């Protein structure tokens, strides 16, 4: 029996997360873990490897590919799958691909709904998953702050924030009917600082987009967007300037703002984060496309 009082703060969080991951595997028939390639996903993957070592992961990793992720994210994803040998499922909404949905042409709201939310629901239906593990944290955003660790979803993958199950200590209600599912958030109680310190202490690989570098960026929708490919409209690309920037969060490149930074190492990122007064999701345009944007997206099935 582990004496939690003798564990460091990070080791307590690690132990809680590993307990939750093992609870999912013990209680559900067909779980899956979301893998969006960012820092939180990287921590989740590391925790899962620890939780079930030396065995292979007992569930696949699912990546919903919107076709607009940073090129480096896709390269990093494929390399990690090759290095670690986990089962990677990649899914894209075929209707969205046919319609050639673009964040530039159709806007963040339509793009996110079609390529992310609908794509995710299609992937979950196709896989028949009854538990979906994700790396969302309560300190990220206000709608996530009020969500349970084991978050119930109906047969349409919808979340009702007014009808959540009580969670007492580390006792979780995992009962569901056929067709229903649960979203599980093992690092709910972690902060952004916890994540970065854990990455540093455990030596977890992350995409270099998190580190400051001279990159070509343009001003778009009130934030700095990196020029990642030639699908960016020429009128925007022609205004590109090289700046020393990095990203605090990763997503579709036209919807993910960079910040000016000189942090090129993990200790420098941690120091910069401690001095920051803004949220890490400040640069995510999908959080600003309507009032209460994230909560409305989650109600419809977004992660």
From Swiss-Prot:
Name of the protein: Sulfate adenylyltransferase subunit 2
Subunit structure: Heterodimer composed of CysD, the smaller subunit, and CysN.
Superkingdom of the source species: Bacteria
Organism (species): Sulfurovum sp. (strain NBC37-1)
Pathway: Sulfur metabolism; hydrogen sulfide biosynthesis; sulfite from sulfate: step 1/3
NCBIfam families (alphabetical): CysD, PRK05253.1, PRK12563.1
Catalytic activity: sulfate + ATP + H(+) = adenosine 5'-phosphosulfate + diphosphate
The gene coding this protein: cysD
One GO MF term attached to the UniProt entry: sulfate adenylyltransferase (ATP) activity
Enzyme Commission no: 2.7.7.4
Coiled coil: none
Family: Belongs to the PAPS reductase family. CysD subfamily.
Pfam families: PAPS_reduct (PF01507)
The entry's keywords: ATP-binding, Nucleotide-binding, Nucleotidyltransferase, Transferase
Reported function: With CysN forms the ATP sulfurylase (ATPS) that catalyzes the adenylation of sulfate producing adenosine 5'-phosphosulfate (APS) and diphosphate, the first enzymatic step in sulfur assimilation pathway. APS synthesis involves the formation of a high-energy phosphoric-sulfuric acid anhydride bond driven by GTP hydrolysis by CysN coupled to ATP hydrolysis by CysD.
Gene Ontology biological process terms from the UniProt entry: hydrogen sulfide biosynthetic process; sulfate assimilation
């Amino acid at each position: 029996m582990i004496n939690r009082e003798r564990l460091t703060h990070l080791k307590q969080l690690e132990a809680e997360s590993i307990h939750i991951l093992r609870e999912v595997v013990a209680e559900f028939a067909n779980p899956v873990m979301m893998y969006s390639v960012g820092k939180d996903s990287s921590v989740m993957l590391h925790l899962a490897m620890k939780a079930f070592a030396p065995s292979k992961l007992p569930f696949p990793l699912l990546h919903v590919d919107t076709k607009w992720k940073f090129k480096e994210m896709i390269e990093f994803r494929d390399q990690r799958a090759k290095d670690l040998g986990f089962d990677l499922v990649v899914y894209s909404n075929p209707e969205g691909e046919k319609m050639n949905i673009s964040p530039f042409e159709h806007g963040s709201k339509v793009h996110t709904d079609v390529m992310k939310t609908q794509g995710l629901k299609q992937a979950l239906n196709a896989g028949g998953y009854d538990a979906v593990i994700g790396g969302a944290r309560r300190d990220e955003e206000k709608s996530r702050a009020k969500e349970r660790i084991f978050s119930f979803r109906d047969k349409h993958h919808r979340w009702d924030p007014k009808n959540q199950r009580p969670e007492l200590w580390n006792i979780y209600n995992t009962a569901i009917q056929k067709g229903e599912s649960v979203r599980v958030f093992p690092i709910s109680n972690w902060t952004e600082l916890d994540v970065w310190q854990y990455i540093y202490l455990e030596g977890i690989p992350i995409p270099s987009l998190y580190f400051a570098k001279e990159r070509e960026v343009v001003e778009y929708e009130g934030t700095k967007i990196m020029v990642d490919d030639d699908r960016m409209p020429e009128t925007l690309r022609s205004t590109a300037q090289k700046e020393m920037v990095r990203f605090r969060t990763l997503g579709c490149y036209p919807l993910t703002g960079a910040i000016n930074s000189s942090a090129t190492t993990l200790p420098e990122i941690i120091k910069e984060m401690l001095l920051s007064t803004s949220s890490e999701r400040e640069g995510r345009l999908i959080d600003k496309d309507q009032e209460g944007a994230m909560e409305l997206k989650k109600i419809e099935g977004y992660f």
